[in-house]
A protein has these predicted regions:
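Conserved thiamine diphosphate
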Residues: 3-61, 230
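Thiamine diphosphate
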Residues: 5-11, 19, 71-72, 76-232
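Residue-level recognition of hydrophobic positions within alpha-helical transmembrane segments
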Residues: 27, 65, 163-164
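Domain-wide signal for the mature, well-folded portions of proteins, strongly enriched
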Residues: 34, 65, 181-185
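Acidic-histidine catalytic/liganding microenvironments
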Residues: 37, 61-62, 132, 160
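Helix-enriched interaction subdomains in cytosolic or periplasmic regions
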Residues: 39-42, 49-87
Length: 232
């Protein structure tokens, strides 16, 4: 457009997500509407990635980016020193990716990929799967949603019986379908079953707490989808 590359170090912060009773106009997950825009990177805040260094890194690239901030994280502390709780640990050995695990990061029945906004639900599902079903899980939390850093994750994905991608948005043209397509393209011959996608119900989001929980993805939604896939 300009005959040369123009630096544009711009980050647009975008609060997203439900679970706070804000109703249909302040609870949406908008990530999927920006997937595939040329030159636009998408990031999401998580309790594993320090926002300061991450934002500096994004700005240093000189390209536009969106930084999605799930409002449920605003009042939570970051995890530090590789410890989540008495059951779970995490590592950041893969740049930009947190791996949360109870036993070993490289060997699990299920790999659960989830953005930062639903980390708590993903870990609660992983805990329930391990204690009640003896299904081990590794939760993958990327800081960059798009373009998704698939290559360094291929070894752990290749070993899993089930790969599940969970997100709070409604189904259809989502970040999860984009990542699943990439995984299928790379690992289809090695996979035991297609990627399992878990989303919120296709509905406006109620303000009432009990109705909101019925619409939005919960840890039980994730758990049941993984158990069903393994039993199929």
């Amino acid at each position: 457009m300009y005959g040369r590359r123009v630096s544009m170090p711009v980050v647009v912060r975008c609060p997203v997500g439900g679970g706070r009773g804000y109703g249909p106009t302040h609870s949406q997950s908008l990530q999927k509407h920006f997937i595939g825009v040329p030159g636009l990177s998408l990031y999401e805040m998580s309790p594993f990635h320090d926002n300061g260094p991450l934002l500096r890194e994004i700005l240093m690239r000189g390209e536009p980016a969106m930084f999605f901030e799930d409002k449920s994280l605003y009042g939570r502390r970051m995890f530090t020193d590789g410890v989540v709780d008495k059951m779970f640990s995490y590592d950041l050995t893969i740049p930009g990716v947190a791996r949360v695990f109870a036993e070993q990061a490289d060997a699990a029945d299920c790999v659960l990929i989830a953005p930062g906004g639903i980390v708590q639900k993903a870990m609660k599902a992983a805990r329930s799967l391990l204690l009640e079903e003896e299904i081990s899980s590794v939760v993958i939390v990327p800081s960059c949603l798009y373009p998704f850093p698939l290559e360094p994750l291929l070894p752990i994905l290749r070993q899993a019986e089930v790969i599940c991608i969970a997100e709070e948005s409604t189904a259809g043209g989502t970040w999860g379908t984009e990542v699943a397509q990439q995984i299928h393209q790379e690992l289809w011959d090695a996979m035991q079953r297609p990627v399992v996608l878990v989303n919120s119900d296709s509905s406006v989001i109620p303000a009432s707490e009990h109705l909101e929980k019925q619409v939005l993805i919960q840890h039980t939604t994730i758990r049941e989808a993984i158990v069903e896939a393994l039993r199929a």
